[in-house]
Amino acid sequence: MTLPSGHPKSRLIKKFTALGPYIREGQCEDNRFFFDCLAVCVNVKPAPEKREFWGWWMELEAQEKRFTYRYQFGLFDKEGNWTVVPINETEVVERLEYTLREFHEKLRDLLISMELALEPSDDFNDEPVKLSA
C-alpha cells in the first residue's frame, strides 16, 4: 500500500520500528499508525503479564506532505488497554514527558529526512507537552 505521501506503508513500518519499541503494527490501519510507551510500572509485585504501566500513546496519520499526531497520557491496564487517567505523581509525569519528547524528536528527524513534516492534528488542542521548538 502506498500512502498519500507516495511512500510505501511497509517501508514506513520498517523505519518506524527502527525508532524503538514504540510501534504497534496490529493497531495500524490504512494511513494511520499507532505508537505507545510503557514508561513507568505502577506496581512491580504482580507477575509481569499482570502489571500495569503509566505511559503514553500516539496516533499518527499520513497526509500528502505531512504526518499529523495526537497523543494521550494514561494507564495501560492488565488487559492491555489504554485509559486516559490523571497522573498525580510529578516524577511519573516528568518521565512520561521525557520519553514522549525523545520519541517525538526521533520521529520528527526521520520524517524530515523523508521531506515530510510532523505537526499536531488540526483538531488536537490538548498539547500539554511542548514537543517542537
Swiss-Prot record:
Species of the source: Salmonella typhimurium (strain LT2 / SGSC1412 / ATCC 700720)
Keyword Cytoplasm applies: yes
Protein name: Sigma factor-binding protein Crl
Function in brief: Binds to the sigma-S subunit of RNA polymerase, activating expression of sigma-S-regulated genes, such as the csgBAC operon encoding the subunits of curli proteins, and BcsA, involved in cellulose biosynthesis.
Gene3D superfamilies with a match to the protein in the record: Sigma factor-binding protein Crl monomer
Main localization category: cytoplasm
Keyword terms of this UniProt record: Activator, Coiled coil, Cytoplasm, Transcription, Transcription regulation
One GO CC term, this protein: cytoplasm
NCBIfam families registered for this protein in UniProt: PRK10984.1
Protein localization: Cytoplasm
Organism placement in taxonomy: Bacteria, Pseudomonadati, Pseudomonadota, Gammaproteobacteria, Enterobacterales
Pfam family, one: Crl
Induction and repression of expression: Induced at late exponential and stationary phases, and at low temperatures.
Domain of life of the organism encoding this protein: Bacteria
Coiled coil start-end: 90-111
Region (Essential for activity): 99-122
GO BP annotations, alphabetical order: positive regulation of cellulose biosynthetic process; positive regulation of DNA-templated transcription
Family: Belongs to the Crl family.
Sequence intervals crossing the membrane: none
UniProt cross-references to HAMAP family, sorted A to Z: Crl
